[in-house]
């Protein structure tokens, strides 16, 4: 219910549906509107965001767990420095590769960035492919029990004896929803998930979240999920991986090893890095190059399927088919929607 009464003009033109909908009018008067843009890896999120920002006077907030790290540029498809100079970007290059960065850190950094952008009468545009991070932004940071050294030691022993895949299979049985959102090689997240289940008797996906100001309450969130045609996306992933190698991904990985990426399990296991770290560790054998590249492409493709699964859970994200549309055309659709609510 609105806290006041209005007489609504029901003869307004179809374009002005804000005039006909009390909820939309309430949002328009009392909430600031922000834009959330996601989509699978290789769907063109970056190009769309760069086209969209000037249309709505926006600044971009990265929703990516690896783009926060300095030096992880090519493998994360980080937006160019030139583009960042033209359009302000937030949450990029804010950590050294050895420093930890988790979903709680992201939540508070992202909220702070949005407040800063809005204080200057600009529009926050959150862009990325991490469903877990978007969920934290909308719902608040996760609240879980403290780590239990004994349980962790037991789980580490299982991983040592039977491999991380055994732990992942266990997590898949106990909490398939959460397991689908992480990679089967991410030992830290797998162990943390099993630890929470063992300590609380509840699935991670069912766990309570901290009672803090939530973006979904504070702002009117207009959220979009880019949905390219499957064959197009597959081809794009292949070309993207090839381009990264041509741009110097292997040299980037060598540099990160020198900077201590092994000290950061999350960064060390990131797709596009773990495959080539293994290749370098095995002596850079020429006969293993093509197989490593195949794994790189395959892992990237499988991750896109996890992303789609995650975002299907959230009705706030509206699917936007992109077949036959340029980045500008997609941006115009989103800008038109934003202007209706702002």
UniProtKB/Swiss-Prot annotation:
The keyword ATP-binding applies. The lineage of its organism: Bacteria, Pseudomonadati, Chlamydiota, Chlamydiia, Chlamydiales. Catalyzes the transfer of a dimethylallyl group onto the adenine at position 37 in tRNAs that read codons beginning with uridine, leading to the formation of N6-(dimethylallyl)adenosine (i(6)A). The keyword ATP-binding applies. Keywords: ATP-binding, Magnesium, Nucleotide-binding, Transferase, tRNA processing. InterPro entries: Dimethylallyltransferase, IPT, P-loop_NTPase. Its cofactor is Mg(2+). It is an enzyme of class 2 (transferase). One of its GO terms (molecular function) is tRNA dimethylallyltransferase activity. Its EC number is 2.5.1.75. This is tRNA dimethylallyltransferase. It catalyses: adenosine(37) in tRNA + dimethylallyl diphosphate = N(6)-dimethylallyladenosine(37) in tRNA + diphosphate. The gene is miaA. Belongs to the IPP transferase family. Monomer. Pfam families: IPPT. Residues 64-67 are annotated as: Interaction with substrate tRNA. It comes from Chlamydia pneumoniae (Chlamydophila pneumoniae). Gene3D superfamilies: 1.10.20.140, P-loop containing nucleotide triphosphate hydrolases (3.40.50.300).
């Amino acid at each position: 219910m609105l806290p006041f009464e209005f007489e609504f003009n029901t003869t307004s033109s179809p374009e002005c549906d804000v005039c006909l909908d009390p909820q939309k009018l309430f949002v328009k008067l009392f909430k600031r509107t922000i834009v959330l843009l996601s989509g699978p890896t290789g769907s063109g999120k970056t190009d769309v965001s760069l086209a969209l920002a000037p249309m709505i006077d926006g600044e971009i907030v990265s929703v990516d767990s690896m783009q926060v790290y300095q030096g992880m540029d090519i493998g994360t498809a980080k937006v160019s420095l030139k583009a960042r100079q033209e359009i302000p970007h937030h949450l990029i290059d804010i950590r050294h590769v050895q420093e930890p960065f988790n979903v709680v850190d992201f939540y508070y950094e992202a909220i702070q960035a949005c407040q800063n952008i809005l204080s200057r009468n600009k529009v926050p545009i959150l862009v990325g492919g991490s469903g877990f991070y978007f969920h934290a932004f909308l719902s608040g940071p996760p609240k879980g029990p403290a780590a239990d050294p004994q349980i962790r030691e037991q789980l580490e022993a299982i991983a040592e004896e039977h491999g991380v895949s055994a732990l992942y299979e266990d997590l898949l049985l106990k909490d398939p929803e959460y397991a689908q959102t992480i990679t089967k090689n991410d030992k830290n997240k797998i162990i943390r998930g099993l630890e929470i289940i063992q300590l609380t008797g509840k699935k991670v996906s069912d766990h309570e979240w901290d009672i803090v100001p939530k973006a979904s309450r504070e702002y009117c969130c207009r959220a979009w999920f880019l949905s390219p045609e499957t064959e197009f996306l597959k081809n794009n992933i292949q070309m993207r991986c090839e381009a990264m190698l041509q741009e110097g991904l292997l040299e980037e990985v060598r540099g990160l090893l020198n900077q201590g990426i092994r000290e950061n399990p999350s960064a060390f296991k990131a797709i596009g890095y773990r495959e080539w770290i293994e290749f370098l560790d095995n002596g850079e054998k020429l006969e293993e190059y093509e197989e490593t590249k195949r794994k790189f492409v395959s892992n990237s493709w499988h991750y896109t399927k996890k992303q789609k699964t995650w975002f299907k859970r959230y009705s706030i994200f509206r699917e936007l088919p992109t077949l036959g549309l340029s980045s500008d055309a997609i941006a115009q659709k989103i800008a038109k929607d934003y202007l209706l609510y702002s």
